[in-house]
């Protein structure tokens, strides 16, 4: 539990930096929330149930039928501050078939990564929660999602 408290403190610090002296509202945030999912994915099902259980209103987007564009991925990656490889579904068959790890290790640029990710939603780590255009850690991390949503 101590790690969760620490993570919550970090997220609150980031929010303070983003919002300056504006107070951070307590309780669930009211925002434009986009939930990118692959409906057959068990982690996506768990994340969806968690959001619904918390009473969070969100829009959904099928990550394969309407996969993210290179431009969206670039914006989300930049806003996240995470390494681009965190946006790849490293456990997926397509990731292994295309030997993406070797390409990343060989120095694939961020722009090349965005283009590759945009070719097929199955390459993208899911679920992906986007709040007001800014992503939360790719994949379902309850502590990070709770902190970002002020829960």
Please provide the spans of the model-predicted regions:
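Short, Lys/Arg-enriched N-terminal segments with co-localized hydrophobic residues
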Residues: 12-29
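Class I S-adenosyl-L-methionine
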Residues: 45-48, 52, 96, 146
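A short beta-strand-loop structural module common to alpha/beta enzyme folds
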Residues: 57-67
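Local sequence-structure signature of Cys/Sec-based thiol-disulfide redox active-site neighborhoods
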Residues: 31-49, 61
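Extreme N-terminal basic, low-complexity initiation segments
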Residues: 2-9
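Secreted/luminal cysteine- and crosslink-motif detector
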Residues: 5, 18, 42-45
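Thiol/selenol-based redox catalytic cores and closely related redox-interacting motifs
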Residues: 65-151
């Amino acid at each position: 539990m101590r790690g969760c408290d620490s993570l919550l403190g970090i997220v609150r610090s980031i929010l303070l930096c983003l919002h300056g002296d504006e107070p951070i509202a307590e309780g669930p945030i009211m925002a434009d929330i986009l939930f990118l999912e692959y409906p057959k994915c068990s982690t996506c099902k768990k994340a969806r149930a968690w959001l619904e259980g918390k009473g969070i209103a969100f829009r959904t987007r099928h990550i394969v039928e309407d996969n993210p564009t290179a431009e969206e991925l670039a914006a989300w990656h930049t806003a996240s501050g995470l390494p681009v490889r965190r946006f790849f579904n490293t456990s997926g068959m397509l990731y292994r078939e295309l030997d993406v790890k070797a390409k990343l290790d060989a120095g694939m640029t961020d722009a090349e990564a965005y283009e590759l990710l945009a070719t097929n939603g199955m390459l993208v780590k899911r679920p992906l929660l986007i709040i007001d255009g800014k992503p939360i850690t790719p994949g379902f991390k309850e502590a990070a999602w709770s902190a970002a949503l002020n829960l």
